Amino acid sequence: EVVFEGDRLEPEFEYVAGQWGTVWLREGSNANIKHLTIKNAIVGLLMQNSTLTLNDSQIYDCSNYGILARVSKIVGKNNVLNSAGQSCLAVSIGGDYQFTHCTFNNNWNSNKQKAVLITNYEKNEDETITASDLVRANFYNCIIYGSNNVELFLDAIESVAFNYLFENCLIKFNDFGTRIEKEVLYDFIRK
């Protein structure tokens, strides 16, 4: 096992998020990672147009994201992403993602974070939209859970593809009385 964590090893810092930056997989990177533990980062793994195979790994206590992937490709098996200030897994501007036997659990102490966030676009500060096809975001036998009523956030624009599948997954989703109560992207959960 390889462990990336903050350099403060006293017990009171064990669960403190944001002690160091990120593991950055830059454009064109192709990584194969097994048995990795990331703790206390700002962003555990930051990906921009890169490819990752991630197996038997853990990402805990990140102040922003466990994994933030833009226009990337991830195949993940048997991973745990837990506690992040914004999202354990955030994929934006499309890409290609497959997760099997993974747990995404977010018990952060606010009501704004999500365990999993999936979009096919991103809006820049000047309101410009960057979009790309979400070729696939498939989750097989995964757990998506946390401290909020809705732990899965889907958001798409129609001009590019938005393909997703959740098969045999446990998803915490109680949307009664929320702004997404009638959103068709979530119809697969309500059936």
Where do the model's predicted regions map?
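Beta-strand/loop edge motif enriched in small/polar residues
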Residues: E1-K191
